[in-house]
Amino acid sequence: IGALTHVGQSEVIAGNGAGQRFNDAGATKILCGQQEQGNVALTERCEGLAETFSGEVVIEFMGLDADTSEQQNTINAALAADTDIDGFMGVGPVITLSGLRAAQDLGRDLTIGGFDLTPELIGEIEAGNIAFTVDQQQYLQGYMPVLLLFLNVTNQNTLGGGLPILTGPGFVTPDNAAEILALSEVGTR
């Protein structure tokens, strides 16, 4: 189709990294909550998690982001029904926050991880309420293609060798959350 390369994140590789982080945190059973049915990328995030996580992963649709009350109630019910769940992975920022609220409602101490960035999510990471979020570095996903096209047109450069140029996964943790939040406020993260 004439594409030079793909600049982005492999959702499976990103999920793999999340699985390793849950292993490091000592989790044994994770609920991987999805906010859209049939979205292949979100499914790949959970499947990648399951590939590297040494415990059990339960993948469930938890309701749409548009109705966070229903979403949180669905997560509450899943957590109440299975007290062995000690980790929650949201495959987007809104559902990650819904998972945190559900755990808080039930008084459950879960290791919580997520995907993507919002100021509220980064704030919860900085506060220590969420362990991490996967950062696909969307700024790079916009910046790098423009740079690559410019270099191709003006200097006949190509990068990637026909393979994707990955922008993630990066991880936002309590160690770097304040800096990432500051960078997001100026529009580069």
Residue ranges and their predicted role:
Residues 1-189:
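A residue-level marker of the well-folded mature domains of exported/periplasmic proteins
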